[in-house]
Amino acid sequence: MQKPQSIPILRALHTACVVVGLLASQMSHAQVAPSQAEVAGYRGLHAAAARGDVAKIERLVATKADLNVRDAYGRTPLHVATFAKQNGAVRALIQAGADKSALENDRYDAVTIAAVADDEETLRTLLSLGASAKLMTSRYDGTALIAAAHLGHDGVVRQLIAAGAPLDHVNNLHWTATIEAIVLGNGGPRHQATLRALVDAGANLQLTDRHGKTPLALARSYGYAEMVQMLEKR
């Protein structure tokens, strides 16, 4: 018979295995940036977006080029410019009328692409030009905020919160941004700052994962003392 003190250890190991499995699943559906071969084969607006060639974008726009043309992976020129961190191209495309909410094949929009890349400058440009922080994106029915919280991109998280991102959206893994900051984070300074931003913004700390665990219970189970202290004060 197992000793009683071994049960919490087994539970922790089970939780860790579940998270590892979910991480592997998420990686299989991660964002796919254009490959070097794809970029080399681009023409028109896709090529100009990848290079950040604003003058070429403006010339093509003047000829009525399709601003939302898709590559083989469903990426528009705006997606490509965002992946390439070509801030000037992002601005030029949006100002010309590009669809700010377009989703590529894995259902990512430009805002979520910038959030995952921790690209605060491009994100700031997108949001200032009217791109939404509220879209449901990815195959996990998540949001840019959930993706950024998962990765501990605290500056991005603060921008998204300021832009009205839904704090308590629950994805199809039954996780909120707050929960992902804990269970998919490492408990380090950036994930702590992410959690702090969410808590200070008023995230609902009573929402649970599909096993009924609150953020506080999850932080305790992972041994994240700083996060536990933060959550206990609420």
For each feature predicted by the language model, list its residue ranges.
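Ankyrin-repeat-protein effector appendages
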Residues: 2-4, 30-44, 163, 183, ...
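Intrinsically disordered, low-complexity regulatory segments in ankyrin-centric signaling systems
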Residues: 2, 28-63, 72-75, 95, ...
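Ankyrin repeat A-helix N-terminal signature
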Residues: 47-52, 80-86, 113-119, 147-153, ...
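Start-of-repeat signature of ankyrin repeats
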Residues: 41, 74, 107, 140-141, ...
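Ankyrin-repeat inter-repeat connecting loop/turn
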Residues: 67, 100, 133-134, 167, ...
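Ankyrin repeat boundary/linker residues
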Residues: 38, 71, 104, 137-138, ...
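Ankyrin repeat structural motif
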Residues: 53-61, 86-94, 119-128, 153-161, ...
